[in-house]
């Protein structure tokens, strides 16, 4: 089954939420729908991002998983952008 990544650019946190709560929540949301392979925090162009790698049978399902994660994460933090990539050999190709 193909591997995908959702990269969620994180903005302001909801009052009372600590920064270390964002990544576990993003991974939990993805895990509600599919198998989580890995999770990581990255700084991309100065913006903190929660990155969750997961399995999905198609691009359409991967996009739905990413949308679910972004919508659910809005209760924890502002989601500035969402990007979905698919593993193609040794490269990650943009899906959404």
Predicted regions: what they are:
Residues 1-96:
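Long, contiguous binding/interaction regions
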